[in-house]
């Protein structure tokens, strides 16, 4: 009975000895290096099962690892002809977009832009209200020449740009006015400090601050 069991275990013992041969200290170190080397390629060894470190598979493992390449760019999977057709198609799409929305260049010289001038000039402003005494207030007004343009084919629904000499820096104050019967009225006035050419895209008009204001420019 014991001989029968020993005979049945003999093939299994031979297979184990062939798969895992005896190693000395140097051999055990090289075997550990082989195991660590196999762990550095988890994706390449995942489909080969648990017998990847057996001596039967060690010779082919290096070839499989060298042929295993990670592809991140989908163009690398295309052949040369398919890649060429894709590049031609992308170039045609870019040209079509440039034709439908081309850049417009206006031939405007630097000398024409330099002729645009806008200044803040001093004057004496008379601020008054009905039944009140007027007050003379030093102020400034904008005067100059600003370049404007009109481009045909402007998109419908959009106003044409209009350039004007307008205040770029100003502040508003409340000015007291002495009125009849000893009453005191307050009038809001805009004090202009600096002016420059600005472009507007609407036709809104700016009404003067205060009804019945008078302007006396300084000569």
Swiss-Prot record:
Domain CTCK positions: 118-198
PROSITE patterns: CTCK_2
Chain segments annotated as transmembrane: none
Gene Ontology biological-process annotations: animal organ development; negative regulation of activin receptor signaling pathway; regionalization
Cross-referenced InterPro entries: Cerberus (IPR016860), Cys_knot_C (IPR006207), Cystine-knot_cytokine (IPR029034), DAN (IPR004133)
Family: Belongs to the DAN family.
Induction: Down-regulation during the establishment of embryonic left-right axis could be due to translation repression involving BICC1 and DICER1. Subsequently transcripts are degraded in a DICER1-dependent manner. Attenuated DAND5 expression lifts repression of NODAL and defines leftness by induction of the left lateral plate mesoderm NODAL signaling cascade.
PANTHER family noted in UniProt: DAN DOMAIN FAMILY MEMBER 5
Primary location group: secreted
Gene Ontology CC annotations of this record: extracellular region
UniProt lineage: Eukaryota, Metazoa, Chordata, Craniata, Vertebrata
Keywords associated with the record: Disulfide bond, Secreted, Signal
Residues in coiled coil: none
Oligomer status and interactors: Interacts with nr1-a.
Name this protein carries in UniProt: DAN domain family member 5
Span of the signal peptide: 1-19
């Amino acid at each position: 009975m014991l001989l029968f069991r020993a005979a049945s275990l003999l093939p299994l013992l031979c297979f184990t000895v062939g798969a895992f041969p005896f190693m000395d200290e140097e051999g055990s170190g090289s075997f550990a290096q082989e195991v660590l080397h196999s762990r550095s390629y988890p994706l390449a060894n995942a489909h080969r099962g648990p017998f990847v470190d057996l001596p039967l598979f060690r010779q082919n493992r290096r070839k499989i690892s060298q042929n295993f390449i990670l592809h991140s760019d989908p163009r690398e999977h295309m052949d040369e002809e398919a890649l060429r057709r894709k590049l031609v198609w992308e170039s045609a799409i870019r040209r079509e977009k440039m034709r439908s929305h081309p850049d417009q260049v206006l031939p405007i010289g630097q000398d024409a832009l330099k002729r645009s001038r806008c200044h803040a000039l001093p004057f004496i402003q008379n601020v008054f209200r009905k039944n009140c005494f007027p007050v003379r207030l030093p102020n400034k007004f904008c005067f100059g020449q600003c370049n404007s343009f009109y481009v045909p084919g402007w998109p419908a629904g959009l106003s044409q740009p209009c350039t004007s000499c307008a205040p770029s820096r100003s502040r508003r104050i409340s000015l007291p006015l002495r009125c009849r019967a000893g009453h005191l009225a307050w009038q809001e006035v805009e004090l202009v400090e600096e002016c420059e050419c600005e472009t507007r895209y609407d036709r809104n008009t700016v009404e003067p601050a205060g009804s019945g204001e008078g302007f006396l420019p300084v000569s």
